[in-house]
Amino acid sequence: CLVGSEMCIRDSPCALTIGTYGVARRREDKKLRFYSMNFEQLGVIESSVEGLKPEKEADWTNYPKGVMWAFGEKGMEVTNGMDLLLFGNIPNGSGLSSSASVEVLTGYILRDQYGFEVSNQELALIGQFSENKFNGVNCGIMDQFAIAMGKKDHAIFLDTATMEFEYAPIQLEGAKLVISCSNKKRGLGDSKYNERRSECEAALAELQQVIGIESLGDLSEEQFETYKSAIKDPVRVKRARHAVYENQRTIKAVAALKANDITEFGKLMNASHVSLRDDYEVTGIELDTLVEEAWKIDGVIGSR
Protein backbone atom coordinates (compact mmCIF):
# COMPACT_ATOMS: atom_id res chain seq x y z
CA CYS A 1 0.00 0.00 0.00
CA LEU A 2 1.53 3.33 -1.07
CA VAL A 3 -0.53 5.43 1.35
CA GLY A 4 -3.40 4.38 3.60
CA SER A 5 -3.87 1.35 5.81
CA GLU A 6 -6.39 -1.36 6.62
CA MET A 7 -8.05 0.81 9.27
CA CYS A 8 -8.58 3.69 6.87
CA ILE A 9 -11.70 4.06 4.79
CA ARG A 10 -9.66 4.98 1.74
CA ASP A 11 -6.53 3.16 0.60
CA SER A 12 -4.19 3.53 -2.35
CA PRO A 13 -2.64 0.11 -3.00
CA CYS A 14 -0.98 -0.96 -6.22
CA ALA A 15 -0.30 -4.35 -7.78
CA LEU A 16 3.15 -5.93 -8.06
CA THR A 17 4.84 -7.97 -10.76
CA ILE A 18 5.47 -10.81 -8.30
CA GLY A 19 2.75 -13.19 -7.24
CA THR A 20 1.49 -16.76 -7.00
CA TYR A 21 1.25 -19.15 -9.94
CA GLY A 22 -0.71 -22.38 -10.08
CA VAL A 23 -1.43 -25.46 -12.15
CA ALA A 24 -4.73 -27.19 -11.38
CA ARG A 25 -6.49 -30.34 -12.52
CA ARG A 26 -10.09 -31.11 -11.70
CA ARG A 27 -10.63 -34.61 -10.33
CA GLU A 28 -13.56 -36.99 -10.73
CA ASP A 29 -13.62 -37.80 -7.01
CA LYS A 30 -13.80 -35.58 -3.90
CA LYS A 31 -10.11 -35.66 -3.02
CA LEU A 32 -8.01 -32.49 -2.74
CA ARG A 33 -4.25 -32.79 -3.25
CA PHE A 34 -2.12 -29.70 -2.67
CA TYR A 35 1.59 -29.19 -3.28
CA SER A 36 3.63 -26.01 -2.94
CA MET A 37 7.08 -25.65 -4.46
CA ASN A 38 7.75 -23.11 -1.70
CA PHE A 39 7.09 -25.67 1.04
CA GLU A 40 8.51 -28.82 -0.51
CA GLN A 41 9.27 -30.24 2.95
CA LEU A 42 5.51 -30.51 3.58
CA GLY A 43 5.02 -32.77 0.57
CA VAL A 44 1.52 -33.40 -0.80
CA ILE A 45 -1.21 -32.36 1.62
CA GLU A 46 -4.49 -34.18 1.10
CA SER A 47 -8.02 -33.24 2.07
CA SER A 48 -11.57 -33.47 0.68
CA VAL A 49 -14.14 -31.04 -0.67
CA GLU A 50 -16.63 -32.68 1.68
CA GLY A 51 -16.82 -31.19 5.17
CA LEU A 52 -14.26 -28.46 4.56
CA LYS A 53 -12.87 -27.04 7.80
CA PRO A 54 -9.63 -25.36 8.91
CA GLU A 55 -7.05 -27.79 10.30
CA LYS A 56 -3.69 -26.95 11.87
CA GLU A 57 -1.98 -29.80 10.05
CA ALA A 58 -3.35 -28.48 6.74
CA ASP A 59 -0.92 -25.54 7.03
CA TRP A 60 -1.03 -23.20 4.00
CA THR A 61 -3.75 -25.26 2.29
CA ASN A 62 -6.30 -23.75 4.66
CA TYR A 63 -6.27 -20.71 2.35
CA PRO A 64 -7.40 -22.46 -0.86
CA LYS A 65 -9.71 -24.70 1.19
CA GLY A 66 -11.26 -21.57 2.70
CA VAL A 67 -11.97 -20.15 -0.75
CA MET A 68 -13.62 -23.40 -1.84
CA TRP A 69 -15.76 -23.27 1.30
CA ALA A 70 -16.59 -19.60 0.67
CA PHE A 71 -17.76 -20.34 -2.88
CA GLY A 72 -20.18 -22.88 -1.42
CA GLU A 73 -21.42 -20.36 1.13
CA LYS A 74 -22.13 -17.97 -1.76
CA GLY A 75 -24.20 -20.58 -3.60
CA MET A 76 -21.46 -21.84 -5.93
CA GLU A 77 -20.77 -25.38 -4.81
CA VAL A 78 -17.40 -26.98 -5.49
CA THR A 79 -18.44 -30.56 -6.21
CA ASN A 80 -15.21 -32.20 -7.35
CA GLY A 81 -11.74 -32.62 -5.96
CA MET A 82 -8.64 -30.99 -7.40
CA ASP A 83 -4.90 -31.45 -7.78
CA LEU A 84 -3.30 -28.04 -7.20
CA LEU A 85 0.38 -27.14 -7.51
CA LEU A 86 1.48 -23.65 -6.48
CA PHE A 87 4.64 -21.59 -6.75
CA GLY A 88 5.02 -18.07 -5.44
CA ASN A 89 7.80 -15.50 -5.50
CA ILE A 90 6.27 -13.26 -2.83
CA PRO A 91 8.40 -13.47 0.35
CA ASN A 92 6.25 -15.16 2.99
CA GLY A 93 5.42 -13.01 6.02
CA SER A 94 6.80 -9.89 4.33
CA GLY A 95 3.54 -7.95 4.38
CA LEU A 96 3.09 -8.34 0.61
CA SER A 97 -0.06 -10.44 0.92
CA SER A 98 1.08 -13.90 -0.12
CA SER A 99 -1.97 -15.46 1.56
CA ALA A 100 -4.37 -13.10 -0.24
CA SER A 101 -2.57 -13.95 -3.48
CA VAL A 102 -3.28 -17.66 -2.92
CA GLU A 103 -6.92 -16.85 -2.19
CA VAL A 104 -7.45 -14.81 -5.34
CA LEU A 105 -5.62 -17.37 -7.48
CA THR A 106 -7.84 -20.14 -6.09
CA GLY A 107 -10.86 -18.03 -6.98
CA TYR A 108 -9.61 -17.62 -10.56
CA ILE A 109 -9.10 -21.38 -10.85
CA LEU A 110 -12.56 -22.24 -9.52
CA ARG A 111 -14.19 -19.69 -11.80
CA ASP A 112 -12.39 -21.18 -14.77
CA GLN A 113 -13.08 -24.82 -13.89
CA TYR A 114 -16.75 -24.43 -13.02
CA GLY A 115 -17.75 -21.49 -15.21
CA PHE A 116 -18.99 -19.51 -12.21
CA GLU A 117 -20.22 -16.04 -13.15
CA VAL A 118 -18.24 -13.97 -10.68
CA SER A 119 -16.32 -10.74 -11.29
CA ASN A 120 -12.77 -10.01 -10.18
CA GLN A 121 -14.15 -7.65 -7.55
CA GLU A 122 -16.39 -10.42 -6.23
CA LEU A 123 -13.39 -12.78 -6.16
CA ALA A 124 -11.62 -10.28 -3.90
CA LEU A 125 -14.62 -10.19 -1.56
CA ILE A 126 -14.81 -13.99 -1.52
CA GLY A 127 -11.12 -14.12 -0.59
CA GLN A 128 -11.68 -11.72 2.30
CA PHE A 129 -14.79 -13.62 3.40
CA SER A 130 -12.85 -16.89 3.45
CA GLU A 131 -10.03 -15.41 5.51
CA ASN A 132 -12.47 -13.83 7.99
CA LYS A 133 -14.92 -16.69 8.39
CA PHE A 134 -12.95 -19.84 7.57
CA ASN A 135 -9.46 -18.98 8.80
CA GLY A 136 -10.59 -16.60 11.53
CA VAL A 137 -8.34 -13.71 10.54
CA ASN A 138 -10.04 -10.33 10.75
CA CYS A 139 -8.43 -8.84 7.63
CA GLY A 140 -9.78 -6.01 5.52
CA ILE A 141 -10.37 -6.04 1.77
CA MET A 142 -7.34 -4.06 0.57
CA ASP A 143 -4.94 -6.94 -0.13
CA GLN A 144 -7.35 -9.11 -2.08
CA PHE A 145 -8.71 -6.10 -3.97
CA ALA A 146 -5.27 -4.90 -5.07
CA ILE A 147 -4.40 -8.39 -6.32
CA ALA A 148 -7.67 -9.00 -8.15
CA MET A 149 -8.09 -5.49 -9.56
CA GLY A 150 -4.52 -4.26 -10.02
CA LYS A 151 -3.66 -2.41 -13.23
CA LYS A 152 -0.21 -1.77 -14.70
CA ASP A 153 1.25 1.66 -13.90
CA HIS A 154 -1.70 2.61 -11.69
CA ALA A 155 -2.56 2.77 -8.02
CA ILE A 156 -6.10 2.06 -6.87
CA PHE A 157 -8.06 4.66 -4.92
CA LEU A 158 -10.40 2.42 -2.95
CA ASP A 159 -13.22 3.46 -0.63
CA THR A 160 -13.55 0.37 1.55
CA ALA A 161 -16.88 1.57 3.00
CA THR A 162 -18.67 1.68 -0.37
CA MET A 163 -16.26 -0.43 -2.50
CA GLU A 164 -16.17 2.41 -5.02
CA PHE A 165 -12.76 2.79 -6.64
CA GLU A 166 -10.83 4.56 -9.34
CA TYR A 167 -7.40 4.12 -10.87
CA ALA A 168 -4.75 6.78 -10.32
CA PRO A 169 -1.85 6.84 -12.79
CA ILE A 170 1.68 6.39 -11.46
CA GLN A 171 4.10 8.23 -13.73
CA LEU A 172 7.60 7.69 -12.39
CA GLU A 173 9.88 9.15 -15.04
CA GLY A 174 13.28 9.23 -13.38
CA ALA A 175 12.02 7.53 -10.21
CA LYS A 176 11.33 3.98 -9.03
CA LEU A 177 9.26 2.25 -6.39
CA VAL A 178 11.56 0.18 -4.19
CA ILE A 179 10.29 -2.44 -1.74
CA SER A 180 12.68 -3.24 1.10
CA CYS A 181 12.26 -6.36 3.22
CA SER A 182 12.94 -5.93 6.94
CA ASN A 183 13.09 -9.72 7.45
CA LYS A 184 10.72 -9.20 10.38
CA LYS A 185 8.33 -12.13 10.01
CA ARG A 186 4.72 -11.74 10.95
CA GLY A 187 1.24 -12.83 9.92
CA LEU A 188 -2.12 -11.14 10.34
CA GLY A 189 -2.92 -13.66 13.04
CA ASP A 190 -0.12 -12.36 15.26
CA SER A 191 -0.16 -8.72 14.15
CA LYS A 192 -1.81 -5.80 15.94
CA TYR A 193 -4.62 -5.69 13.39
CA ASN A 194 -7.44 -6.93 15.60
CA GLU A 195 -6.31 -4.81 18.55
CA ARG A 196 -6.10 -1.63 16.45
CA ARG A 197 -9.45 -2.35 14.85
CA SER A 198 -11.05 -2.70 18.27
CA GLU A 199 -9.46 0.55 19.46
CA CYS A 200 -10.68 2.45 16.40
CA GLU A 201 -14.19 1.03 16.73
CA ALA A 202 -14.30 2.10 20.39
CA ALA A 203 -13.14 5.60 19.45
CA LEU A 204 -15.77 5.77 16.71
CA ALA A 205 -18.50 4.80 19.17
CA GLU A 206 -17.43 7.63 21.50
CA LEU A 207 -17.35 10.17 18.67
CA GLN A 208 -20.79 9.09 17.51
CA GLN A 209 -22.15 10.37 20.81
CA VAL A 210 -21.35 13.94 19.74
CA ILE A 211 -21.37 13.93 15.92
CA GLY A 212 -23.39 12.00 13.34
CA ILE A 213 -20.81 9.89 11.50
CA GLU A 214 -20.77 6.31 10.28
CA SER A 215 -17.00 5.91 10.16
CA LEU A 216 -13.82 7.72 11.16
CA GLY A 217 -13.31 8.39 7.46
CA ASP A 218 -16.29 10.76 7.55
CA LEU A 219 -14.26 13.26 9.58
CA SER A 220 -11.93 15.96 8.29
CA GLU A 221 -8.81 16.81 10.29
CA GLU A 222 -10.53 19.96 11.58
CA GLN A 223 -13.62 18.07 12.72
CA PHE A 224 -11.49 15.50 14.51
CA GLU A 225 -9.62 18.19 16.43
CA THR A 226 -12.95 19.75 17.39
CA TYR A 227 -14.56 16.56 18.69
CA LYS A 228 -11.62 14.42 19.85
CA SER A 229 -12.29 15.28 23.51
CA ALA A 230 -15.21 12.84 23.31
CA ILE A 231 -12.66 10.00 23.19
CA LYS A 232 -11.87 9.23 26.80
CA ASP A 233 -8.68 7.23 26.43
CA PRO A 234 -5.52 8.98 25.11
CA VAL A 235 -4.40 5.82 23.31
CA ARG A 236 -7.69 5.66 21.41
CA VAL A 237 -7.26 9.35 20.51
CA LYS A 238 -3.96 8.46 18.83
CA ARG A 239 -5.45 5.51 16.96
CA ALA A 240 -8.40 7.54 15.71
CA ARG A 241 -6.17 10.46 14.74
CA HIS A 242 -4.11 8.14 12.56
CA ALA A 243 -7.23 6.76 10.85
CA VAL A 244 -8.68 10.23 10.18
CA TYR A 245 -5.46 11.89 9.04
CA GLU A 246 -4.33 8.90 6.97
CA ASN A 247 -7.67 8.88 5.23
CA GLN A 248 -7.18 12.51 4.26
CA ARG A 249 -3.58 11.84 3.21
CA THR A 250 -4.86 9.17 0.84
CA ILE A 251 -7.23 11.65 -0.81
CA LYS A 252 -4.36 14.14 -1.17
CA ALA A 253 -2.06 11.40 -2.50
CA VAL A 254 -4.46 10.53 -5.32
CA ALA A 255 -4.66 14.21 -6.27
CA ALA A 256 -0.85 14.36 -6.30
CA LEU A 257 -0.61 11.29 -8.56
CA LYS A 258 -3.17 12.71 -10.97
CA ALA A 259 -1.16 15.94 -11.09
CA ASN A 260 2.06 13.94 -11.57
CA ASP A 261 3.42 15.64 -8.44
CA ILE A 262 5.67 12.88 -7.15
CA THR A 263 7.42 15.24 -4.72
CA GLU A 264 4.16 15.97 -2.91
CA PHE A 265 3.31 12.27 -2.98
CA GLY A 266 6.63 11.52 -1.30
CA LYS A 267 5.93 14.03 1.47
CA LEU A 268 2.62 12.30 2.13
CA MET A 269 4.40 8.93 2.32
CA ASN A 270 6.78 10.37 4.92
CA ALA A 271 3.92 11.80 6.98
CA SER A 272 2.15 8.46 6.73
CA HIS A 273 5.09 6.63 8.27
CA VAL A 274 5.41 9.12 11.12
CA SER A 275 1.72 8.59 11.89
CA LEU A 276 2.05 4.80 11.70
CA ARG A 277 5.03 5.02 14.06
CA ASP A 278 3.78 7.55 16.60
CA ASP A 279 -0.03 7.35 16.59
CA TYR A 280 -0.76 3.84 15.36
CA GLU A 281 2.40 2.26 16.81
CA VAL A 282 2.67 -0.63 14.36
CA THR A 283 6.07 -0.14 12.75
CA GLY A 284 8.83 -1.44 15.04
CA ILE A 285 12.56 -0.88 15.08
CA GLU A 286 13.21 -2.77 11.84
CA LEU A 287 10.82 -0.73 9.69
CA ASP A 288 11.71 2.53 11.43
CA THR A 289 15.39 1.93 10.76
CA LEU A 290 14.81 1.18 7.07
CA VAL A 291 12.67 4.29 6.62
CA GLU A 292 14.95 6.61 8.57
CA GLU A 293 18.01 5.42 6.66
CA ALA A 294 16.15 5.94 3.38
CA TRP A 295 15.32 9.51 4.40
CA LYS A 296 19.07 10.21 4.65
CA ILE A 297 19.76 9.19 1.05
CA ASP A 298 19.89 11.87 -1.63
CA GLY A 299 17.21 11.33 -4.23
CA VAL A 300 14.76 9.48 -1.98
CA ILE A 301 11.43 11.22 -2.51
CA GLY A 302 9.50 9.44 0.23
CA SER A 303 9.53 6.32 2.38
CA ARG A 304 7.11 4.49 4.66
What are these language model-derived features?
Residues 5-6, 10-14, 23, 41-50, ...:
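Gly/Ser-rich oxyanion-binding loop with an adjacent helix/lid
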Residues 6, 11, 21-62, 72, ...:
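C-terminal nucleotide
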Residues 17:
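Conserved short S/T/G-enriched processing/targeting/catalytic segments and their helical context
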